[in-house]
A protein has these predicted regions:
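Pol beta-like nucleotidyltransferase catalytic core
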Residues: 180, 250, 254-312
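N-terminal Rossmann-like NAD(P) cofactor-binding module of classical short-chain dehydrogenase/reductase
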Residues: 76
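Short amphipathic alpha-helix with an adjacent loop that forms part of the alpha/beta core around
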Residues: 63-69, 283-288
Length: 312
């Protein structure tokens, strides 16, 4: 059986699902989180980033020492910027026969990983503009099975659930809440902010409201996911589609988004996807009320297709 060393961000259920689908491709997987995510490490990352990086370098060196005598067909990274270039080069020298593959679901503007690109045989990105600018392979994010297998009953309820790390995204959400209140639109949401984000908002003169420090409970998620329409607002430093868009395309929902590039996609239809600009939500009410039919889910965006493309 072929073998993969997988080093990547540990992000909710998504990492486990990626591993499961790699195994379906008949690979044996050895996985390590890319970043130390215990509470102490998170605090160190915020307060003493240089000391944290030294600690993380030692962690990566321990991984390399542990795996130095194991042979792998593929060494897969999902994100790489948390590993020093020195350690990546050392890992590549240790496993010179392996094929090195990188997937980025952040943009170069968010985390500049360009210096790492020459050390990979293939580099994928979720950001279509980065793919064009740096000659990378464009591969959108994916929908996992718990979202792709269940189709939603049509209704006029809008929902949002997600982490908000950027001031612009928070401002957009607050403006949309006001729009919905004014137009009698049912908008269900769970906005999660970290203490760091709250400090950023306060420093920008914004009083945070309508948010939580905690993830939505399973009960609240079931309530939110009764909605047939999703509201999306992207980080303006990134051009790729959010996981929110992909998952809701896969589950057959209607989408309200500010990512105008979606109008160029083969799955786009104006009956299903509404694109707003800045804080102008004119036309959203009519879009919500429209009952025109559209094509449902998008099998090409399911996680199985995503993993297959990564390993091809």
């Amino acid at each position: 059986m072929k073998k993969i060393l997988f080093i990547g961000i540990n992000y909710y259920d998504y990492t486990k699902e990626i591993i499961k689908h790699i195994e379906k491709e008949e690979y044996r997987v050895t996985y390590y989180p890319l970043r130390l995510m215990d509470t102490l490490s998170r605090v160190q990352h915020t307060l003493t980033p240089q000391l944290f990086q030294k600690k993380q370098d030692r962690y990566h060196e321990e991984i390399m020492e542990k795996e130095k005598n194991n042979n792998y067909d593929i060494i897969l990274f999902i994100q790489v910027h948390d590993m020093s270039l020195k350690n990546l080069i050392k890992l590549k020298d240790m496993h010179s026969e392996a094929r090195f593959v990188l997937y980025n679901w952040d943009s170069v503007k968010t985390h500049d990983y360009r210096k790492y690109i020459p050390y990979f045989h293939k580099v994928f990105t979720f950001d279509y503009q980065d793919a064009e600018d740096y000659n990378l392979v464009y591969l959108p994010l994916f929908g996992i099975e718990k979202y792709t297998q269940k189709q939603v009953v049509k209704n006029k309820i809008v929902y949002f659930v997600g982490n908000v790390c950027h001031t612009h995204r928070f401002i957009t959400l607050m403006a949309f809440i006001k729009y919905c209140q004014k137009n009698n639109i049912e908008f269900r949401y769970h906005i999660c902010c970290s203490p760091v984000t709250v400090c950023k908002l306060l420093c920008a003169g914004i009083i945070p409201q309508h948010f939580s420090f905690y993830r939505a409970s399973d009960l609240k998620m079931r309530y939110l996911l009764e909605a047939f329409i999703v509201f999306d607002c992207r980080n303006h430093e990134q051009n790729g589609y959010t996981m929110r868009i992909i998952e809701n395309l896969c589950s057959g929902r209607k989408i309200i988004t500010d990512n105008s590039h979606i109008e160029l996609e083969p799955f786009y239809s104006k009956e299903r996807i509404f694109v707003y600009q800045d804080l102008n939500f004119e036309g959203v009410k009519n879009f919500i009320d429209s009952e025109r039919d559209f094509i449902g889910n998008c099998p090409g965006l399911h996680i199985g297709a995503f993993v297959h493309n990564l390993l091809a």
